[in-house]
């Protein structure tokens, strides 16, 4: 049944109509959640697990008494589907809806608030009636930058996720512009998907998946094949990609606390080399993952021997300097400055750290700070020609920036002056008009007084 017109015609309450004619949408078929579509939605697509959904709703007890309504608050209710943020009946019911659909749900207590209720409005063991309108839904933004949107087709098992360095076995299907360009089973190490022609967005998303999870990933160019594209697959530069990924199995990599100092130092040497290979290949996000491992393993390592301490400091210094370079390439200049700060905390006179921090600050238009760093480079190495050129660049950019500001402010002041002059002119015109009207009234009055005697008998 797709409407409740029958209920209107025979006088039945919507609750009674759903109880008699509603479709059982529970997996157990225990009539715990019954549904009637009041208004058919658009298209065939329905929300998936993890989607952010936007709804309007009215909630009533079985006796017809209203206990809640989003309409009364004049704003939609928003939640993530299938995450336990709402009652079970809603996670079940909204998952069956299409955009624009309005439906009625009748929910037994075990799919609502159960024996506890939700006092004072909802008593114990209450059967609830809802009218729900699905306004919109969209996938889960994994990193809140729009670069990776996940839509979960099948929920995974358990709560464990692969970590960086985990060995995973997945099935993937890649599409671009409606064309499938990749379909295979593949095993690889998370963070090293590039070695298997897998974009970095897959590595990132896998760290948020569970075993046997199946999802659709929408990757922006930054998390796809970027500006280079992928000629092997016929992918143009800056293409948006869609991947369907199933995580079949995984084995987690050792966590930092599971490794002794010797192992950490050995692994640091390995990942440093991997990071350098990625950097030289222009794979800066992949390089960040490798250099970041060194920081996670060694930054908080204590109780080292003198030899271990020197080795650890050397790896950390290289990692921070290389991370700064990667972040600058990724145009994440604030992070680049932070990494340089860490490097300079280990070696305050490090020329590379000072130079790279200066570069990042110059790109952030922090001209004085950048100039100061390049001057410090010259204190360390007076023969550094690049630093001298950068000081000249800072001075030039600062001058251009100041001149541009002066022009902007001059134009602003000119506009303000013109506006003030216009307002003064309007006031003067208004005053003149007012005086003219007064004079005309005086003349008319005088004329009437002169004519008045002639009108008398």
From Swiss-Prot:
SMART domains: TPR. GO terms for molecular function: peptidyl-prolyl cis-trans isomerase activity. InterPro entries: FKBP4/5/8-like, PPIase_dom_sf, PPIase_FKBP_dom, TPR-like_helical_dom_sf, TPR_rpt. It holds the Pfam family TPR_8. Inhibited by FK506 but not cyclosporin. Gene3D superfamilies: 3.10.50.40, Tetratricopeptide repeat domain. Part of a heteromultimeric cytoplasmic complex with HSP90AA1, HSPA1A/HSPA1B and steroid receptors. Upon ligand binding dissociates from the complex and FKBP4 takes its place. Interacts with functionally mature heterooligomeric progesterone receptor complexes along with HSP90 and TEBP. Interacts with IFI44L; this interaction modulates the kinase activity of IKBKB and IKBKE. Interacts with IKBKB and IKBKE. This is Peptidyl-prolyl cis-trans isomerase FKBP5. It comes from Pongo abelii. The lineage of its organism: Eukaryota, Metazoa, Chordata, Craniata, Vertebrata.
């Amino acid at each position: 049944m797709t409407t409740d017109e029958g209920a209107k015609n025979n006088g039945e309450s919507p609750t009674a109509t759903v109880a008699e004619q509603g479709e059982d949408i529970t997996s157990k078929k225990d009539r715990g959640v019954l549904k009637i579509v009041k208004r058919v939605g658009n298209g065939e697509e329905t929300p998936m697990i993890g989607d952010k959904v936007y709804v309007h709703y009215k909630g009533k007890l079985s006796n017809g008494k209203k206990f809640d309504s989003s309409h009364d608050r004049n704003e939609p209710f928003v939640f993530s589907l299938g995450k336990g943020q709402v009652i079970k009946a809603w996670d079940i019911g909204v998952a069956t809806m299409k955009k624009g659909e309005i439906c009625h749900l009748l929910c037994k207590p075990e799919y609502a608030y159960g024996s506890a209720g939700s006092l004072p409005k909802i008593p114990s063991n209450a059967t609830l009636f809802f009218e729900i309108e699905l306004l919109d839904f969209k996938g889960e933004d994994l990193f809140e930058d729009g670069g990776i949107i996940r839509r979960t087709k099948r929920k995974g098992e358990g709560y464990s996720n692969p970590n960086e360095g985990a060995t995973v076995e997945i099935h993937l299907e890649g599409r671009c512009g409606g064309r499938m360009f990749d379909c295979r089973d593949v095993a690889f190490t998370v963070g090293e998907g590039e070695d298997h022609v897998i974009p970095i967005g897959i590595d990132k998303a896998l760290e948020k998946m569970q075993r046997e999870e199946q999802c659709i990933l929408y990757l922006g160019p930054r998390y796809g094949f970027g500006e280079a594209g992928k000629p092997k697959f016929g992918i143009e530069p800056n293409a948006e990609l869609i991947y369907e990924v199933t995580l079949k199995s995984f084995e987690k990599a050792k966590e930092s606390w599971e490794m002794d100092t010797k192992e950490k130092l050995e692994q640091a040497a390995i990942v440093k080399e991997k990071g350098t290979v990625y950097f030289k290949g222009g794979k800066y996000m992949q390089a960040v993952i490798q250099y970041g491992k060194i920081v996670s393993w060694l930054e908080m390592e204590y109780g080292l021997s003198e030899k271990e301490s020197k080795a650890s400091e050397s790896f950390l210094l290289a990692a921070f300097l290389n991370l700064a370079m990667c972040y600058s390439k990724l145009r994440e200049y604030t992070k680049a400055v932070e990494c340089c700060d860490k490097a300079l905390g280990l070696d305050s006179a490090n020329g590379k750290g000072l130079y790279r921090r200066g570069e990042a600050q110059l790109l952030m238009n922090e001209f004085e700070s950048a100039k100061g760093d390049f001057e410090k480079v010259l204190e360390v190495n007076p023969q550094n020609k690049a630093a001298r050129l950068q000081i000249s660049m800072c001075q030039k950019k600062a001058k251009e920036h100041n001149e541009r500001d002066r022009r902007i402010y001059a134009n602003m002041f000119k506009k303000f002056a013109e506006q003030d002059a216009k307002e003064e002119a309007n006031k003067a015109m208004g005053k003149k008009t007012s005086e003219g009207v007064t004079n005309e009234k005086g003349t008319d009055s005088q004329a009437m007084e002169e004519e008045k005697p002639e009108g008398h008998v």
